[in-house]
Structure formats: structure tokens, C-alpha cells
């Protein structure tokens, strides 16, 4: 239906969607977004003063930081983090301050067995990082790269920390994956809000509307990242500052894409392919694909979260490299010079990803770019790789075959010799 909406918008000469539209957002789209967020946040949203439309969520974050941050200001990032955040903070003149999430394995009773686990935010770590220099905190839930869903308690820690920050400190809540909270067990399912099952909007917490800019986009929700339409929702005193900056960055996001999205949003609420809504279909489809990839990873010696214990979201698995897989990595590849790797050295995660791509045709992302350089060089990222499952079933099954080849090589005592001969 999103493609059909685009076709209709392209052909609708009466709406004239092929010309410039309002720089702060096409009227039809901001009206639809305001309607939706009014229901999400249980408050009336003004479409023309509390919504801004941007060229993707990345630009939404960039413009938010540009209006909030000046040289010397600090911005708190939860580590690991989406790698784009750090340089956007620096481009605004700010200083990133990293708060490590703590990885807690499910079981460490056998030192020879690597298990999955969960990432948690410790209140003390956050409180130590926030000072009167803190002008923004970037919160991303569901989280890229780990798939973590921040709990309500953890979000309340963030809200509490604002008491220690600059009085004008703002939380930038990156919620691009909010409709992709995987189907949790019923007893673990959090509150629901207009098809956002399992998702808590940070701005809905008591007193947080005035301190929050909520960022999202069409790309992840409608599997249309090339559409490049994002948005910001927040109080007028913050959003109108972004309105003032928008005409100097681009005149407007694509009018015809905005019109297509405005038509798609109400259609997404309707029954879709046997589900109550498109959003329910999306959630179940990604949960199914996640499980396909997770099973293949487990069978190949990687450790992944137990999703009955640890609800997840987004479309990545942050897998832990098993001991057999790690030992199969040729020693010549580890700590080898690599200009692309953080610090110019390929630690285990980087070397593993390069080896799997070059030798086995299996492509995933090393975890070190999601960590500060200091922590990556200390080895915090060595054990993890990020794998996407926003793929066709055929691609996931081909990945499973590649993982089996990797596992067979890992179980062979001649693994390193085979690499050297090749």
C-alpha cells in the first residue's frame, strides 16, 4: 500500500505534489503525524508548531543538535551507540560523554562456553556522567546495534538524571524502530499505544514532554529507507527553532514522498494480510526472520540473546563470537594493520568480519565502530558482531549455509592451515 500511495500521489495533479511544499513539512503529512502522536503521547499535538519534517531521521538528529549544542557543551551517549551520533555531536561543537551499557551474560559457570546475555543501564554510571555541562542525552530504543529495549525503570533513570544537567538539557529520543518491537511473551509485553506494542515513548513520561525531541522516520517502518523522510515531534519552543534552520539546509523534503506517506499512515492502521494492522504484520514478520537467523547463529557457535528472557527490537542481532569460531580465526589476521579499523588495528571483531566476508561470503558489521575508540582499544567490542535480518528468507537461508561452512572450519584442527594455503 505504500507503493500504491506513492503511485497515487505521483498521478494526483490536483494536489500538485511535484512542487515545493512548506519547508517545515507538507501540511497533509504533519497533520497525520500530529494525529498519530497525539494518540501515542495522550496529548494534543499542534501539527504546525510541534512537528518538523526532515530528509530522513539522520538529518532530524543533525538539526536538533545544531539548535541545541554550542562549543563546550556535553552530550551523553549510551555505549554501544549508533556510530553516526558521535560525529554529529562533534559537528555541532559538542563533546560526547559515553555511558557504557553493562553486558550481563546469562551464565558464566563454564569458562569454555560463551553465552548470550542482556545489556543494562546502571543508574550509577548515568548519574556520574551527567553534569551541569550536559545539554543533551541521546536515547535510542529499540537500540541499534544491540536490539535492546530500554525498560521503563531505565527511562526513569534518564528522566531523573536531568535534575543534574543544564536546566535546558534535552533528551533526543531516537525511535525509528518503535514499530519493530519483536513479539514478546505475553507476560513480558509492556503497555500498548496505537499499535506501538512493547514501546514506551520517552516523551510520555511525567514531565518529559517539555524536555524531549522525539525523532523517527518512514524508512524503517515501511521498509523504504530510500524515501528519506524523517520527522521531529516536540514542544514548540524547541521545534520552531528547527523550523527556522530548515530553509537554510534544504527548501523541503520531497513533496511527493511526503504526500505518499501522508496517505500511507492511515492505511497502515487497517487490517493487513491477516493481521489487525500493518504494524502487527511488520512485528511478526521481523520476529520470524530474527528467529531464523538466531537459530542459524546458535547452530554455528555464536551466542545470541534468549528472546524469551530479553525482549528485543529493530532488525539486528548483536551476536557474541563463540570460542570455537574465535579460535578458527587465523592468527595472522588478528591485530593486523588496517586503515579502516578503529585505531588502524584489526582487533578480533574487525578481523572476524573481514575473514568471514572474504573467505565465506558472509557479511556482517564489526562492533568496534559502535564503541568509543578508547573502549574499543581496551577490547570492549572484541566479542561482538552485528548481523541484519531485514532480508528475504532466501538471503537468510544462504547466510545460514555460510555460517555452517564457517562452523565446519572452526571444528577442523586444520582451520588455520587451510587459510594459509588458500
Task: Indicate where each model-derived feature is located.
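Active-site phosphate-binding strand-loop segment of PLP-dependent enzymes
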Residues: 101-196
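Eukaryotic N-terminal low-complexity, Ser/Thr- and Lys/Arg-rich leader segments
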Residues: 111-114, 118, 128, 186-194, ...
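Conserved glycine-rich beta-strand-loop-beta hairpin in the small C-terminal domain of fold type I
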Residues: 262, 278-294, 304-339, 380-381
